[in-house]
Amino acid sequence: MANNIDILDYCHSTNDVVQNIVNYKKNNDNYNYLEKHDDENAGISKNNIGVNSNYNRVFVFNNKRGDETKQIDTNMESITPYININSLESTKKINLVDESSKNYNMGNNWYHQNKYNNKMNNSKNSKNSHNKHISIAHIKYDDQEINEKGKNKLYEENQTNTKKTWKRRAFSPFTPGGVRSSTVLFLCTAIGVGLLSIPYVFSELGIILSIILILLNSLESYITTNILCMSSLEHNIFVYGNLLEKIGNKYYKTLIDFGLTFSFLSGYVLVLILVNDYLSNILYTFNFPSFISNRIFITIVICLLVLPLTFREHIGSINCFLVFSLFSITLTVLAVGYQSKYYMSLLPEKNISLFKINKHFFKCFNILLFSFSQQSNACFITGQFNQPTQRRVTKSESRSILIQVIFYTLFGLLGYLSFLNTTKDNIILNYEETNMSILLCKFFLCISFFFSIPLNFIATYPSMISLYTSIRNKIQKLYSVLFTRNEYLPSFSNILRYDTENPFDEYTLDENTENSSTSESQGDDMFQRKCAAIFVTCLCAFVEFNVSKLSNFIGIFGGFTSSIISCILPNLIYYKNMHTFKNKIERYATLALLCFFSVIGLISSIVTAFIIIY
């Protein structure tokens, strides 16, 4: 009897294990199905299953029984390779107690009957499992088909989006530091007063030679601009003078600072002269009062309007105005082209020159060199990029050069065909004062030249401060040598500097910024920037009041400084970094081209000066 009780306990424990195995098998099948289904659609992995999932309850059979129960479980798993789920569910607990010998035959019959039922159920389960696998395969196939359809839809949407990308880029607002805004900065730096003299070049040299020189100067401008931009990226320096100081020495820095400062001042005065002439002509044509069209009054108004723009530290805040400058130049080209046929019909002689060389060749070469001069702001514009990579910078500068070639070729050709050999050095002067379309172009050109002043000031400001600091330090050293034993030295040092403890110490480069040449030229020093802007504006206005025919003087010295800025110094930078180019033919061909333009630029400035003087 005791043995029967032990057997019953064992059977109960075994039945519990079997029931747990049944539950496990059900849960595991459901989990496997869900896992496969989810993996196909949502990509859920086993590592992402939560704590409450069936996967975490697989091995929890009967923890209350202890180690013996675990041993029984493992034995049953090893002995029974296959367990029929349905037979385990339908089979009742076996009663092994023999109450009488009569029940032996019944038990034997029950055993055979149960064995037969198990075979039938196994066949049914195999069919069900086969059908189940077929259904899962269908589900997988359907899911794959759905995924393929979804991918096709996404691909079609991406294709449509890429087709619309150029429209979105063309009409979306400019982002500061983007490729388009940087292209506009390059264009506004290069396209300026020199545009109005391009038709004069065509009249002096002919159409073919003028186009050849335009292409050559565009090639030179692209090479030198690319040299400056890539050198700025390589050394992480975005001021022209600082870049030359690192590659060469401090004398190169002083030279470029002087060249950039003088070029900006001369350009400022020239813009004031042209804007004053155009506005006075417009106001006089529309019968404004005489005091409004007065030269001094117009100059004061222009200076008061341009001062707040020069106080800005970053160029991104005036991007919209720079786009308007390009619009005004485009309008001028269209107006000249629209009237070219009419003015050409008025000419008595219609002799079109294709190729000719005369004494004005060097002067015309200088004009084209000025027109493509965007190198002065190349380092500054490179520093304005939000992602200054080589690909983005090259894309921006190449686009600007291409647009300049198109503008100059069209404007020069249309302007030359309008007046042929009677074309003046400023084509606007060929039109009568009552021409309304030209008056409108004059007004828009005034706006374009007006916004070129703050652009060039922001780029030239570090060079002006660096030049001022170097001159001040030289004066301090000179007085320190002359008056070392003089009692007036302390009072003089107090006048020059507030630092009485170390009055003759030179300023050094600021390690916290790379866009300033001295510690005084940091962007947060707004007071110093305002003082410099006011001083420069007053100086240029004073010169414009007293000298109205400064164009020849500016052409001589401006051409000389432009040759240094655009040809000689980029050539020096390329010569220092020439070892980085592996192709020797490309290396020496580029060096020869830069040397040619450097020599021609200097010779052109000298010859132009002699022609003007004599």
Curated annotation (Swiss-Prot):
Compartments (UniProt record): Vacuole membrane
Disruption phenotype: Growth of the asexual-stage parasites and maturation of male gametocytes are delayed. Parasites are less virulent, their growth does not result in the development of cerebral malaria and causes less neuronal inflammation and cerebral complications. Asexual-stage parasites have swollen food vacuoles containing altered range of hemoglobin-derived peptides and less hemozoin crystals that are also thinner. Swollen vacuoles are also detectable in the male and female gametocytes. Parasites exhibit lower sensitivity to quinolines.
TM ranges: 184-216, 222-243, 255-275, 295-311, 318-340, 360-380, 401-417, 437-459, 531-547, 553-575, 587-613
InterPro entries: AA_transpt_TM
Main location, first listed in the record: membrane
Membrane topology: Multi-pass membrane protein
Highest rank taxon of the organism: Eukaryota
Biological role stated in the UniProt entry: Putative amino acid transporter. Involved in maintaining the osmotic homeostasis of the digestive vacuole. Important for the timely development and growth of the asexual-stage parasites and male gametocyte maturation.
Additional remark text: Can transport antimalarial drugs.
Family the UniProt entry places it in: Belongs to the amino acid/polyamine transporter 2 family.
PANTHER family linked: AMINO ACID TRANSPORTER (PTHR22950), VACUOLAR AMINO ACID TRANSPORTER 5-RELATED (PTHR22950:SF678)
Name of this chain's protein: Putative amino acid transporter AAT1
Organism: Plasmodium berghei (strain Anka)
Lineage: Eukaryota, Sar, Alveolata, Apicomplexa, Aconoidasida
